[in-house]
């Protein structure tokens, strides 16, 4: 509105109307007399307004009319239940009803319409949604809601049902969900169920659902190149388990199914001793031909280029080839030297050779197929020593040059063939020092320091940059992030995280940087977020199942694993894996040791079994 008067004087608005003659009117003793109109802003030419309450209020009132059966112009007869409604509302929400009521169908002229092949409870929930925009999808109703939503062409409800089923996937039900998705043409759900089935085939093949599969669906599954198996023996064993579940009806399909088992990829011993000697296989001529084909492939290596086909093509399981190492950490009141290896293919943790020193707060990275353990704290002293592990020999060597500073709670990563050590603390102060190791020269050299001192910092490499994420400046946890450009030897700040985090886990996954867990000013965290370098923004993802400070984070064969940590009351040995398709974490086993502040590294699986460590060859603390 108008300006407020100031300093006790009275200001006359410029638009005030003044009465009198000539603009100055004098009366009586020469006093000035005037009349001032009320001050108003100029009238706008138009005033636009959109009510945020109107849609909700209108729907609420329409729903009240429906419930009181007022102004309803159609009754839906579903399974003997009568549902009163308004044609215009149903037509606006559903293409099915729009076609029914606006076309030339007989129903367009009827006041009572019978709807067949739909569950009455599902119909009532969907009509409620049309009037309220609210629905609850749960295990007890999703199998009737989804078909009903498909029939009524309520795409939003279809998507919600599919999202719910995606979150329910596990090895015991994924085949049923896959079939359900296929029946109702839910392509995205079918794709994800297929992917889940392929990825978890070793567990799926043990389920009752697998034994009940129709032959066509079995073939669809086992013919996939993406089937995740340790060897083709597992596929053959799965097929024979399925066959023997109902031999009388299924033996006629054996050759049809066996042609999708890649027999030429079996070991000669298994092919001859197990497949070739099986009575069901031997009794079928087409099956015998498949076995002979595989024998020829194995016996005539010089002819193999001429024998290539679908059965000679190795499968490409997403998990094959990489293993995760958990290194050092804090357990049972002391730093530990133990190291263990996780194989996602078998879901097993195995002990390997321990380091020569106990190390908590150790930085771990893989360079040239060798695992480096940098610095840390041995329970008494801060360390600058380095150890290097060779998985082929299962041995640690200590001939790596030490860092120029002692460092624990240090971030370590590999960029352009150099090993970088970032931040940490040396027992006196929190560090912003950064140095890098040249394996050809066996030498460390300093590069530009960070702009902020950081201990408990997480580091990641993406797009040719080295990122330093969170940590603590020695006083409080940080949410700031900076990145190093090796071309200009310079650190630059980027967008901060939404949460302050020290001792967090960090990894690059699908071109995002994921930051999980850690500790803020008050407590250990389960929350997680990810950074998009293209938009320079952080966005939240679903929280982990446990709070985890001092957690390790790594990508193994295309899956993101969170390893160990501290939940505020106990050291953890559990691990969990993140599925970006469903935005869910799930627990997937335990390490042999509880580990806080251990390092993690990912390597190609060794070619031999010489890396296995005898678990009783050294004393283990309580795990």
Curated annotation (Swiss-Prot):
Phosphothreonine modifications at: 19
Record's keyword annotation contains Metal-binding: no
Effect of loss of the gene: Defects in synapse differentiation and growth; undergrowth resulting in reduced numbers of boutons and/or branches.
Chain residue ranges for the region called Disordered: 1-54
Protein function: Probable substrate-specific adapter of an E3 ubiquitin-protein ligase complex which mediates the ubiquitination and subsequent proteasomal degradation of target proteins. May have a role in synapse differentiation and growth.
One term of GO molecular function: ubiquitin-like ligase-substrate adaptor activity
Kelch repeats: 323-369, 371-417, 418-464, 466-511, 513-558, 559-605
UniProt GO cellular component terms: Cul3-RING ubiquitin ligase complex; cytoplasm
Biased composition (Gly residues): 20-32
Record's protein name: Kelch-like protein diablo
Keyword terms: Actin-binding, Kelch repeat, Phosphoprotein, Repeat, Ubl conjugation pathway
Taxonomic source organism: Drosophila melanogaster (Fruit fly)
Record-annotated BACK domain positions: 174-276
PANTHER family named in the record: KELCH PROTEIN, KELCH-LIKE PROTEIN 20
InterPro entries the record matches: BACK, BTB-kelch_protein, BTB/POZ_dom, Gal_Oxase/kelch_b-propeller, Kelch-typ_b-propeller, Kelch_1, SKP1/BTB/POZ_sf
Membrane-spanning segments: none
